[in-house]
UniProtKB/Swiss-Prot annotation:
UniProt cross-references to InterPro entries, sorted A to Z: IF_rod_dom (IPR039008), Lamin_tail_dom (IPR001322), Lamin_tail_dom_sf (IPR036415), Lamin_tail_domain (IPR052877)
Homology family: Belongs to the intermediate filament family.
Top-level taxon of origin: Eukaryota
Organism encoding this protein: Dictyostelium discoideum (Social amoeba)
Gene name of the encoded protein: lmnB
Subcellular location: Nucleus lamina; Nucleus envelope; Nucleus inner membrane
Domain IF rod span(s) in chain numbering: 132-515
Biased composition (Polar residues): 532-545, 565-584
Role noted for this protein: Lamins are intermediate filament proteins that assemble into a filamentous meshwork, and which constitute the major components of the nuclear lamina, a fibrous layer on the nucleoplasmic side of the inner nuclear membrane. Lamins provide a framework for the nuclear envelope, bridging the nuclear envelope and chromatin, thereby playing an important role in nuclear assembly, chromatin organization, nuclear membrane and telomere dynamics.
Protein name from the UniProt record: Lamin-like protein
């Protein structure tokens, strides 16, 4: 409606200009009529007519047209005068008079001399009319040019209106599309916000899970540290007890040595006194006895010096132990003070003995003849005491060697535990660093991302990486648990094993029962086969057939019967193995093979068919040519072996992870077989301290000879 109104308003100036042209033509026609033809119009009392003002972009400007009516007194003629104002030298507007009477040209208004002309038919009037025609023709030409300009402007306006309408339609369409797009974008934003909230909740859940796992790891680490600390405290207590016992024994032995020294000095005084007062023969005898006792005194002095050196050695060892444990400082200081006090007492006793010797020299010589027999008895008892002391010293040295071996084992285990702790600390530190880096990366990515699609993709990638890390952490925990389990299997039997081993034993109890039944059947068949082999070769085949027939008839139905039958046949058809090649000696353990090149020790265990033989608490000791020793003890809980079994001890390597091992043990001590190997002694010690010894040759391989039979076996 607005566009139609605009078009009507814009078309009105053209119509007014056409009406004006028609009026001007009619006016020229009326001027050629006689004078008396008059144009009459209805009178209107000063009613101004206003024209529609039109605006154009280039040439048309605002114009105001005023129409005035003037009436003459004689003929009542209404005259209209138009005045137009033009700015900037262009036609700005056109007049549209109210068509009520035929207008006349108001020339007399501008030329006052024309108003005095008498009649219209005068020649001045005709000239005036001619001028008016010229003016009208000029006005017509101007109006035509103005009309052309108006038409061109109107066409341009119509074009612009059409363009405006097209643009308006396009804008409305684009606005609708933008509104639809904005609605879609708002929906997408809502969906993405929901997805983002879900992802953030998932991320928080994952972070909580990681925190819980970290707390579990920390708890496990604290438990392991407590266990290690308890084991270390136990080892320190055992070491302190052993050292205190040794020190007490050393003090007692020193006291006995001091008593013997005092007795020797007393005897020396007797001899010297009798030598002075007696005859020459007795003097010679006493001199010989004196020299002999002097040699013994020197020996005892050497023993004292060696004991002093041992005391110094113990002091040095105590000082070294003082660096490793703070709890031993007070005890070591007390022991050092006791040793110094004893040394002072020894010196005081020596001084007092020397004084007493000077005082009692005369008295002792008088009693010499009476005590010669007693002296001989004392010498004999002294020799016996000497032998007893030597045996005690040997036992003490053996105990010290065992303690050193145990200390080496404990040090190896402590080193392994420290390595495991460092590995766990490193893994926990790396995980913490990775978590912090992932958090930083996630923050940067959340800040740098501009589109929600990219955020979702990155969050999914982060979740996948966290899942992978969780999986890797779980595998790492399983691996560390298996390593701890393998380490606990190698711990000294005096230290109690973890409860996990008992639970694992309960889990595999059913499997062990089936395995024991199968081994029992096989061992019976082997025993029967060995007995038959000693009698006759033909009897062996008959025994095999009978044993296989009995096992097939008495075995269970299904797959278990077929497998046991096959196992029995296989065991009966292998007479050349290491278990069948030697005679069966129940309740014995012997060396079968010692190979220093491939680093393993193979033992042959002969267990009773009823109760079996367990090698728990048995020990292996390797003595190098330079005197250094290393020991390995079999752990508790080893099932008894029935029949002839081969047990292998691998040295210098840890227990393999994820692979079951049967009758195999692992001694993690490294550099056990370093050159030179020749002369290395390998000892097998039973719980009752019975020892079997093997010496390695130059090639480092010892193999039990086939004819030896029982030469290296330890009979229980």
């Amino acid at each position: 409606m607005d566009m139609s109104k605009k078009k009507s308003k814009r078309a009105s100036p053209i119509e007014s200009s056409q009406e004006e042209i028609a009026i001007s033509t009619s006016k020229t026609a009326t001027t050629e009529k006689p004078k008396k033809t008059k144009t009459t119009t209805k009178k209107k009392a000063s009613q101004p007519s206003q024209e529609v003002v039109m605006e154009t972009e280039s040439e048309v400007e605002i114009t105001t047209t005023t129409t005035s009516t003037s009436t003459t007194n004689n003929n009542n003629i209404t005259t209209t005068s138009t005045s137009s104002q033009q700015s900037n030298g262009t036609l700005s507007s056109s007049s549209s008079p109210t068509i009520q009477s035929i207008p006349t040209t108001p020339i007399s208004k501008y030329i006052p001399s024309l108003s005095q002309i008498g009649t219209p038919l005068s020649p001045n009037r005709a000239a005036q009319r001619l001028r008016e025609k010229d003016e009208l023709s000029l006005i017509h030409n101007r109006l035509k040019s103005a009309l052309k300009k108006l038409e061109s402007a109107e066409t341009e306006l119509e074009k612009k209106n059409q363009e405006y309408e097209e643009l308006d339609q396009k804008h409305t369409a684009t606005i609708k599309q933008l509104k639809q797009r904005s609605d879609q974008v708002e929906k997408q934003l809502i969906e993405e916000q929901n997805q983002n909230s879900d992802l953030t909740s998932n991320r928080n859940i994952l972070e909580n899970e990681l925190k819980s796992k970290e707390s579990v790891w920390k708890k496990e680490k604290d438990e392991i540290l407590l266990k290690f600390q308890e084991s270390i405290n136990k080892l320190n207590q055992e070491n302190s007890l052993a050292q205190s016992q040794l020190k007490s024994e050393i003090v007692s032995k020193e006291y006995e040595i001091d008593g013997l020294k005092s007795e020797i000095n007393r005897l020396k005084d007797d001899l010297q006194y009798r030598i002075r007062e007696g005859e020459e023969k007795s003097r010679k005898l006493l001199e010989n006895e004196y020299n002999r006792f002097k040699g013994k005194e020197e020996e005892y002095n050497q023993l004292i010096v060696s004991k002093d050196e041992e005391i110094k050695k113990y002091k040095f060892e105590l000082k070294e132990k003082e660096k490793s444990s703070n709890a031993m400082n007070k005890k070591e200081n007390e022991l050092n003070n006791l040793i110094q006090a004893h040394e002072r007492q020894i010196e005081d006793m020596r001084d007092s003995i020397n004084r007493e010797w000077e005082l009692k020299a005369a008295q002792m010589m008088e009693e010499h003849h009476a005590r010669t027999i007693h002296l001989q008895q004392a010498v004999d008892s002294f020799n016996e005491e000497k032998e007893r002391i030597k045996s005690q010293m040997e036992t003490l040295n053996g105990q010290i060697e065992d303690i050193n071996i145990k200390n080496n084992e404990y040090e190896d285990r402590i080193k392994e535990m420290n390595v495991l702790l460092s590995q766990k600390d490193n893994s926990i530190g790396e995980l913490g660093v990775e978590i912090e880096e992932s958090k930083k990366k996630m923050r940067k990515q959340m800040a740098d991302l501009k589109s929600k699609d990219g955020q979702i993709a990155l969050l999914q990638i982060e979740i996948n990486t966290k899942d992978n890390k969780c999986n890797t952490l779980q595998t790492e925990t399983n691996r560390l648990k298996s390593e701890l389990y393998s380490i606990t299997n190698q711990i000294d039997p005096e230290i109690p094993l973890d409860p996990e081993i008992n639970s694992l034993k309960e889990l595999v109890k059913g499997f062990e029962k089936t395995v024991d039944d199968r081994k029992r059947k096989r061992s019976k068949l082997q025993h029967e086969f060995n007995a038959a082999a000693n009698q006759d070769q033909n009897g062996m085949t008959i025994e095999e057939q009978s044993s296989t027939s009995t096992t097939t008839t008495t075995s269970a139905t299904g797959s278990s019967s077929s497998t046991s039958h096959l196992d029995n046949i296989d065991s009966s058809k292998l007479p050349t193995g290491p278990e069948q090649s030697e005679l069966f000696n129940p309740d014995t353990v012997s060396f079968s093979l010692v190979d220093s090149n491939q680093e393993f020790i193979k033992l042959s265990v002969h267990g009773d068919m009823d109760n079996g033989l367990s090698i728990s608490k048995w020990r292996l000791i390797v003595v190098k040519p330079d005197g250094s020793k290393s020991g390995f003890s079999f752990p508790d809980g080893i099932q008894p072996f029935k029949g002839i079994k081969s047990v292998t001890v691998w040295t210098g390597r840890p227990r393999p992870q994820g692979t079951p091992t049967e009758n195999e043990f692992y001694w993690a001590r490294t550099e056990l077989w370093t050159s030179p190997v020749e002369g290395t002694i390998v000892k097998l010690v039973s719980p009752s301290e019975e020892t079997t010894t093997v010496t390695l040759p130059a090639d480092g391989i010892y193999q039990k000879p086939s004819s030896a039979g029982k030469s290296n076996c330890l009979i229980m």
